[in-house]
């Protein structure tokens, strides 16, 4: 059984990387040890855009031709392409109409910052975001252009609010026709309805021919809940909110304690 294909899905921020972007040597060592096994598929599954995912894949030494990665909380799936200059090729893109949800949120927070992802470019934004929060080009555009086309992801940011206030806002207004996740700061991501890291990983699993009971996932935030439930073994990082811990099978150390290395040690010993 240990020789059967195994899929290991890893969140990035707060899991692979520390919140300051640091990659711990212990984590890098365990990821590469797993990736060296021919029957193990290490797959990045992140809320990051494609542009900010590719450098992480490269930093981990995972940039092998055809390797899948799940980006934008499941709305965008890519495979490594070492021939076209971008480092990736698009495999699946799911979009939705962002206008109704943006109107609802703005009724409650008229000054909220809004960003709409532009694959391979960056983001169209209503107002510039705090420095360092968005990867790629930020293009300030009027609302008619911001909301004119179907989107893979819409991000709301209110530097004066808290994560709890955003959670209460979502529960109060009701958001229909979309999937959503509140970040650890006052950050709200919208994705197409029914789309999550889990939905994209299920397609990856089937393509790779991995059996459902041979799946592992590690994550730390609310956008990881579906992925942790989907996996046969889900690990929550030690700093994860209570609802994320509840969705997991096991809890590992915090990101500051290199908890991912601890979890992958278990995977190497018990499953791989």
Locate the predicted segments by residue:
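Mg2+-dependent phosphoryl-transfer enzymes with acidic/Ser/Thr/Gly-rich catalytic loops
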Residues: 2-7, 24, 191-272
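Short acidic-hydrophobic, aromatic-tinged amphipathic segments that line or gate anion-handling sites
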Residues: 92-94, 139-142, 251-254
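Short active-site oxyanion
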Residues: 38-43, 65-67, 153, 213-215, ...
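Short, hinge-like loop/turn segments at secondary-structure boundaries
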Residues: 60-63, 86-89, 131-135, 197, ...
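Conserved acidic, metal-coordinating active-site core of Asp-based
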Residues: 108-218, 222-224
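Short, structured coil segments at secondary-structure junctions
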Residues: 60-65, 173-176, 230-231, 246-248
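Active-site phosphate-binding/coordination module
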Residues: 25-130
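Asp-based phosphoryl-transfer active-site loop
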Residues: 4-21, 44, 228
């Amino acid at each position: 059984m240990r020789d059967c294909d195994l899929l290991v899905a890893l969140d990035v921020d707060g899991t692979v990387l520390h919140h300051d972007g640091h990659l711990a040597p212990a984590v890098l060592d365990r990821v590469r040890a797993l990736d060296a096994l021919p029957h193990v598929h290490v797959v990045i599954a992140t809320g990051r855009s494609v542009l900010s995912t590719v450098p992480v894949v490269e930093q981990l030494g995972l940039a092998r031709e055809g390797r899948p990665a799940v980006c934008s909380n499941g709305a965008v799936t890519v495979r490594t392409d070492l021939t076209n200059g971008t480092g990736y090729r698009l495999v699946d893109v799911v979009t939705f109409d962002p206008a109704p949800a943006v109107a609802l949120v703005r009724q409650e927070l008229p000054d909220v910052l809004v960003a709409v992802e532009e694959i391979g470019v960056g983001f169209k934004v209503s107002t510039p975001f705090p420095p360092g929060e968005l990867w790629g080009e930020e293009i300030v555009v009027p609302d008619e252009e911001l909301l004119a086309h179907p989107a893979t992801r819409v991000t709301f940011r209110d530097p004066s609010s808290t994560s709890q206030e955003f959670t209460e806002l979502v529960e109060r207004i009701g958001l229909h026709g979309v999937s959503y996740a509140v970040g650890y700061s006052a950050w709200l991501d919208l994705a197409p309805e029914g789309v999550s890291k889990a939905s994209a990983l299920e397609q990856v699993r089937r393509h790779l021919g991995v059996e459902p009971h041979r799946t592992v996932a590690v994550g730390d935030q609310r956008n990881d809940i579906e992925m942790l439930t989907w996996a046969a073994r889900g690990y929550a990082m030690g700093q994860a909110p209570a609802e994320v811990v509840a969705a997991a099978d096991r809890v590992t150390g915090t990101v500051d304690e290199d908890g991912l290395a601890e979890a992958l040690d278990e995977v190497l010993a018990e499953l791989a």
